[in-house]
Amino acid sequence: MEKAIRNFLSQESAGGILLLVAVVFAMLMANSPLSGLYQGFLGTDVQVRVGALDIHKPLLLWINDGLMALFFLLIGLEVKRELLEGALSSVAQASLPSFAAIGGMLVPAGIYLLFNYGDPVTQAGWAIPAATDIAFALGIMALLGNRVPVALKVFLLALAIIDDLGVIVIIALFYSSDLSTISLAIASVAILGLVGLNRKGITALTPYGILGLILWVAVLKSGVHATLAGVIIAFCIPLRAKDGSSPSEHLEHSLHPWSNFLILPVFAFANAGVALGNMSLDTLLSPVPIGIALGLILGKPIGVMLFSFIAVKLKLARLPDNVGWMQIAPVAAMCGIGFTMSMFIASLAFEQADPMYGDLARLGTLIGSFIAALVGYFWLSKVLPKKGV
């Protein structure tokens, strides 16, 4: 198990570096004479027509609705594996990261709403600081190598996966609108087909892919966010075949490099380009960016630590073996790395609002995530034993 986790984290570390490069490249383009080219590229109309089906969207939305559906497929596969066989497969294992994740979502959301009280437009962004970027957080931890106890790595992995599950629920409940009955009916039929494949023990991935594509189109047209189709598909793919092989894990391993080295960097490049030319100090300290940044920097660690402490004191959970509060605290700070997940929620929260709100949300996310990453890394490095000790 330790070797598998190390392999996973080493890939996350490399992907995290590429993510950072994509963000820097996007910011440079958005604040240079190339800004027109950058915005024009993302606004390029892309149309797909098959018979009566016509999907017509700018490139940015193809990235956010299409590529990110594959990322959520990967998240769904990870969640299912951890629930059935991994770090969340028993109450004892799942209790502490579950309480930590709940606190890590509620407190940042509360801080954001505190700064945006009374404004119905900006209040829509309450879930932005509630997210944790699993790839980036694990990548930062991976930089510390084998100094990090395996139990601490598993705790962060489990917490981040539960956080992702919370984000999925939030998207389904709060960021769906103008629902289409016909599209939802088609989606329901596709889901029944996927469940039927699972129940019959079909392990070939092609039938799941065909029905999954139909489901994605139906969900895209339904008013429910299309990324949720990826999660549904993941939950329907069998974890184990009769011969002991795992179609789910095979697909998960195949998707990981695509996610780390293509999907997430492309998403970051498309969404992180914030033009700073017209922004003043007053703008940076306005309710949206300050609420998000403080939610990530302060809300995440406070929420994770507070709910974890209460759960342990009430004997509802216990600390992992060989892990103390001094090690949990910097990991809680790392949970403030919202990055791609926070930017994704921002794109949903302010989709119909003035583009300025989206820029402010992305800026708050970048500032908060960057500070959380620095604090978490140096804090954890300080409390862990030195190499060779």
UniProtKB/Swiss-Prot annotation:
Subcellular location: Cell inner membrane
Chief subcellular location: membrane
Keyword Cell membrane: yes
BP GO terms, sorted: regulation of pH
InterPro entries membership: Na/H_antiporter_dom_sf (IPR023171), NhaA (IPR004670)
MF terms in GO: sodium:proton antiporter activity
Pfam families: Na_H_antiport_1 (PF06965)
Family the entry assigns: Belongs to the NhaA Na(+)/H(+) (TC 2.A.33) antiporter family.
This protein's name: Na(+)/H(+) antiporter NhaA
Source species taxonomy: Bacteria, Pseudomonadati, Pseudomonadota, Gammaproteobacteria, Alteromonadales
